[in-house]
């Protein structure tokens, strides 16, 4: 029979690392700490180099720490990153999500980022190149050489993705990754190209979304995954491998697409993966490299608050694809991972359902991440490993974030 209110609130007699206080998903103050201590210190994927292929192409990026960033390719073909804010009066410089500054804009001349407010202008490297009537108004007190944009640390790598880090003292991208992408290094050796982009806004915490990529116990929710994976040899042998920094890899397997009605047998592979093989790496705090030959998907989670997350989905193929190969990759990607695909909507629904149910902590005094299966595919070690790193950075115990719960007996 159903439990009483007192029984419902009773804390399970489990080790503390197997229990999570749901308030870490719902507390606005904890989210502000995450912005400062996690997102402002992490390397994050802002876009892919193929999304800004020509000199003077730009993209803007909504950084999870609350910053707006401009990414622009300069005349030397180098991608630069700067805060999207004018040093004069703090106005937003670029409003469009993407485009080019090669031609003139309503605010100013070509090859310039020009503020529409007072026409201060900057080049693609972030240097201030013009202040209208500077001498008349500022005399010698203000000089354009002192008023460049605020640069943001940026690296391009690991498949041509553009990574940014707000921390000027951050370790290199390679150090920060801690070897986590080396396991799929062979899949990132050839130039890639984005052929698909869509986004979803979910009423839930960003960690809820990352949880869906950090455990596969929820494969029961996916008809597609049950048919092509769970019912075949090799599925239960997959393992989680953890890396320093909160990152994790799921070992690859051969998917049986021929078991799914309407799906022809895969004949097109991916560098480092035979047709139909699947590899996945989760990066802390919200990036997932997900490759099911013949296509690749990259997820990036951008929290919009403690209870809302924007997830970007990119589908990628090889830059060297023939038109026929690209068509195969697009069809495969969109039929599985597109907005109406056979795999993705269930994950969105899972996160949305958690966001609804956990909005009132009295309705869920705790949640479990207690599956221990020797790091095999249904072990929840990926979630626990994520929160171990989370605890190191935020300084709160996920099972007792306010230090007011007695610990379970060891």
Task: Name what the model sees in each region.
Residues 20, 24-70:
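Non-catalytic accessory segments flanking enzyme active sites
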Residues 1-3, 16-17, 410:
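Non-catalytic, topology-defining segments of multipass membrane proteins
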Residues 7-22:
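Short, contiguous pre-domain boundary segments
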Residues 51-168, 174-178:
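Rieske [2Fe-2S] iron-sulfur-binding domain
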Residues 1-2, 25-28, 34, 116-122, ...:
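Short low-complexity stretches enriched in small and charged residues
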Residues 78, 84, 153-410:
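C-terminal catalytic domain of Rieske-type non-heme iron oxygenases
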Residues 41-46, 51-54, 133-138, 279-285:
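Short Pro/Gly-enriched beta-strand edge/turn motifs at strand-loop
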Residues 39-43, 91, 218:
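Generic structural signal for secondary-structure transition and capping sites
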